[in-house]
Every structure is written in C-alpha cells, then in structure tokens.
Amino acid sequence: ERNAAGKRTVFIVPVGPVGQYPYFVQRVNEERISLKNVWFFNMDEYLDEHDRPIDFDSHLSFRGFMHREVYQKIRKELVMDAKQRIFPDPDHPRLLTETLEGLGGADVCYCGPGWTGHLAFIEPDAPEFAEQA
C-alpha cells in the first residue's frame, strides 16, 4: 500500500533464510513493482580477521549475495538506488541506526534466527545486550 501510494517503505531484512528472495524478485519483475521508494537495511555481514567486511565475491558475503541474487535480478528500471541498500559498516557503526531514524523507522522487519537463536549475530545471552533485551 505504501509503495503503491508513492510513499517510502523501509525494510529490515536478513540474508538467512533466503527462500523468499526468488519469489520477491519474480513478483517485482512480473508485476513491475517499482522499488524506487524502498530502502533495504540488512541486519548483518561477516567481517574478516581485520574487522573489515569479507570480500564481496566470497560465497559467504551477504552484500555479495544480495547483489547477485536480488538486486542484479530485478529489472534496472525497478530496482532501488544503491544508496538505499544499507549494510552494517565497521567504519560507521551508527550508520544503520542513524539512517533508519532519519527515515522515520522501519515499516517491515523480517528476521531469521540463526542456529544458536541469534538475530543479526547478536547472541541471545550476550551480556552487552542484556539491558536492551
């Protein structure tokens, strides 16, 4: 509804599970749904031993996965601008929070708990998050 009305729609999305993305891409393309007012905030990304995002071409890279399996498969005239695809950035740890707040919050949040019960790599019993739980 928001998108059809030309309003901004903000999603928080995981990379796992990934089964929804082929259906999403197919529907966007078949129904010609413009994502020009849509923002995707990915919850997490792997870092290497130097606390840098792993290589984009790695099969483990969430940025790479989203690019290859989602954004590249959506028709160019429908896909959102690259600046509307937000990932955690170790150089700017508040980027997600500040950008999300600047947009007025999220409209939709999908999550996929990891095998330990974590969400966005935050373990359920992490002491540093106890006050926020």
Regions found by a protein language model. Name each.
Residues P22-F24, H50-R52, A120-I122:
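Short glycine-/acidic-enriched loop or helix-start segments at secondary-structure transitions
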Residues V18-I33:
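Glycine-rich loop at the start of a catalytic domain that most often binds anionic cofactors/ligands
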